[in-house]
Amino acid sequence: SAGEVLVKTLACGICGSDLHALRHGHEMVKSQKETGGPLVYDASRDLIMGHEFCAEILEVGSGVPDHLTSGDIVCSMPVLVRSDGVHTIGYSNEFPGGYAEHMLLSSQLLLPVRNGLSAAEAALTEPMAVGRHAVEKSSATGDDVCLVIGCGPVGLAVIAALKQKGLGPVLAADFSPRR
């Protein structure tokens, strides 16, 4: 479609939400339907997850800006914007995510990967953005003790964002003894 690019996945992270959907997909879809959430798919049908990804542009469609070309390395928000609405990538029976070899992305949502960042590092853009967003939404000030419960990838991203903003001290706790 116009404004879309075909990409080849270079790296894709495994999110806790993917694991939750794998084990509890039917309950997740039911909850989304009841609350008007965006993750409404048929959990009894196949889907290809993966929303933490880095990819290489293979082909550009009509209406794609000239600065985006084949061979560019990009990240993107995990949604596809079309004339009939916004479609979730990965949590969809029709729009595969980053665990697929190829996928379609909306050109207006692409973020070029620069400065020699590896594909594996760039695939962390989404969880790092979630952590930063959480800190931006908080009312934490330099005088606050910040508590982060959960030290998985997003929890670590929150800790990094807190430290980047000069907030803290930061206390972190996790139920997993491995963390």
Predicted regions and their residues:
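Hydrophobic/small residue at the entry helix of a nucleotide-binding pocket
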Residues: 130, 154, 162
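Glycine-rich beta-strand-centered segment in the early N-terminal region that forms part
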Residues: 1-12, 27-80, 114-116
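Conserved SAM/SAH-binding beta-strand->alpha-helix loop
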Residues: 176
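Conserved S-adenosyl-L-methionine
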Residues: 164-169
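Short cysteine clusters
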Residues: 15
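NAD(P)H dinucleotide-binding glycine-rich loop of Rossmann-like/cofactor-binding domains
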Residues: 39-51, 74-149
